[in-house]
Amino acid sequence: MGLFSFFSKKNKPTEPIEKPVVVAVQKQELKPVSYDDQLQVFESLRHKHDPEVTKEMILRDVYEMSWEDATEQYIESNPFSVLYYTFGWRNPQIKNYNYSEKCIWFDLEFFDANVQYKWFMERMGAITNGEITFTDISLETDSDNWEWINFNVNGIPKKWKLERVGYIADHFVHRFSKLPSELSTSRRFTYFDNGGQQWVIGYASEAEQIRFNEKTGLNREWLEESNHFSEPPTNNK
């Protein structure tokens, strides 16, 4: 079961649904880096796939997102940018479902089913390794047809306004960028994309962010500085 099984109906009800969108890659000429060397660099950055994730699974999944027959060569010709996405993938064949607990691979279109707001919030907590926890998450629709998400974050009750039913609230993602400063956490949420509409959210300290970008040559940003999502409403009315 490959990349698009990440979104299959066999997954848990709150998991993302299938959206077959091809991920773009960096266009500039880059010096190829072998698959194994890339993995070694990621491991030095504490990014390691679940033990059940095999090279064959990764190559199959990358093929399904790129349709590149020479899949390993494709990964090597686009060092780190393609392989980084795989740490945010998910597969029901894996006992722990996630390829890792380091990041989330996502796309705004996955919010098309509103239950994905709950799934995304749960995963945003999971990648912080317990530093930020989301509990009692529920969705509701008010009399004006606006959707809301209610939850507790580190025990603090909150309620975020989303959008009218049928519309996607991209500002929902931006809201998470404010939580680390509000909660005085040691790390912050990160953002990366390689030119496509899909992106990866991670969680890092200042030192980890600098080291990640230096070792991979990628331009991973802080979520609050990335300007890829709308600002949330200034009020909840």
List the predicted regions and their residue ranges.
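Contiguous interface-forming segments/domains that mediate binding rather than catalysis
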Residues: 3-237
